[in-house]
UniProtKB/Swiss-Prot annotation:
Name of the coding gene: cyaY
PANTHER family: FRATAXIN (PTHR16821), FRATAXIN, MITOCHONDRIAL (PTHR16821:SF2)
NCBIfam families cross-referenced by the UniProt entry: FeS_CyaY
Record-given protein name: Iron-sulfur cluster assembly protein CyaY
Family named by the database record: Belongs to the frataxin family.
Keywords on record: Iron, Metal-binding
SUPFAM superfamilies assigned: Frataxin/Nqo15-like (SSF55387)
GO CC annotations, alphabetized: cytosol
RNA-binding listed as a keyword: no
Amino acid sequence: MNIAEFHQNIEHVWQKIEEELENQGADVDCETQGSVFTITFDNRTQIVINKQEPLLELWIASKLGGFHFAFKNGEWVSNDGQRFWDCFVEACAAHGENVQF
């Protein structure tokens, strides 16, 4: 994956997150500033998802901790094999929103 594809892929992830959270009625605010996408929940807690361009990785930080994902075989996967979307759903639940992706 080249740099342009990396950015396009992550921006697609961010767009999907924002659209699905809205469609599912989640009480959140989403904001993008540069390479950082922040989801603020009704209880004022946050999930932060950011691009790590030098490593071509997607990072997520939440109440559950920090996780790093690389794009492998068409999806974002951590070193231990966890899929990004599974991690994201678990993180949302930890912040008080039950969503499906």
